Structures are given as C-alpha cells and as structure tokens.
C-alpha cells in the first residue's frame, strides 16, 4: 500500500534498532532504504554503497558547497547527510535527531516519522555485540544523553519502544503504522 512520493523516517539514539529495522523493511516489504552519506569509518560487514556512502570529510564539505544534501549534520565527530538524489518514492531513511527535526519541520503528510526508544543498558549491550569498543560505546551513550534529552525530541508521527521487540517486530510495527497513515491520507 503505497502513495507516490512517500517516505519513512527512522530516528533514535545509537543502537536503538533503526538501521536494522530499515534493512528489514527492505527485505520484508520492499521499502528501499535511502542510502545516506557519512564520514564515519566503515564497520565490519558494512559495504560502501549498500549501508552508507562513505566519503572523506573533505568530500563531504564539497558536497555541502555543491548543495547536494536535503539535510546534513555533525554527529559524534562525523558528518551524515541525505542527498537529494536518494530521496525518492517509498524509501526509508535513518537519520539523527537534527535530521529528524528537519524532516518533521516540513509538515509533509507523506513523510512518516518514527522515533525508536530503548534503554541505555540494552543499547550498550547491542553496541558491544556489534563490535563497538567499550570506550566508544560509553562515549556514544554519553553523547546520546545530551542529544536525546526528552525536550530535544521533535514531534514525530510515532514513537516505538524497541526494548523488548525483535527487529522484525519493530519493522512490522513501523510498516503497519506507515500503511495506516497512508490509508488515512488517501481517504482524505
């Protein structure tokens, strides 16, 4: 159930499940993940052009000057951004809080925004399980405490607690709510 030019926007703190949920939306429902651009180092099992477009900070700065981004931000010392070329029909995008604020401020009914929340303990465990060092995990948690303070989270269409859910359950809930929203829009 799709309308043209719709988008799912997923955000949340580090290791809240947003990237894995986006992958599940692709494999199970055919929602293509918009590939964002970043300057952060590639993790084990990540592939350039599949998970992110990995570029140098210099190239990212050039892309900003060339006005190639819908939104971009500096997060944990690395740049992240959504290029205009990656925004298309029926895509999902995983973004940080500033990107979420940018999309939320558009007030476009076709952009369905989600915030995934999970406890710090679970997120810390997930970070270690995916190969982050303890020091990096601690730094990310500390940074997230500042960034994701409750007053900083913009209005979103839906908040999902991903704490005790599998990635498939989170993706199913995102898809169900997305379809519900699209149905309401098409009936209005």
Residue spans of the language-model regions?
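ATP-dependent small-molecule kinase phosphotransfer cores
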Residues: 38-91, 95-98
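Phosphate-binding P-loop
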Residues: 1-5
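Hydrophobic anchor at the beta1->P-loop junction of P-loop NTPases
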Residues: 10
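P-loop (Walker A) phosphate-binding loop of NTP-binding proteins
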Residues: 13
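Small-molecule kinase domains that catalyze NTP-dependent phosphoryl transfer to phosphate-bearing small molecules
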Residues: 132-179, 188
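Conserved phosphate-donor/acceptor-positioning beta-strand/loop module used by diverse small-molecule
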Residues: 92-96, 107-128
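Walker A/P-loop
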Residues: 18-19
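Post-Walker A helix-loop "phosphate-sensing" segment adjacent to the P-loop in P-loop NTPases
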Residues: 27-35
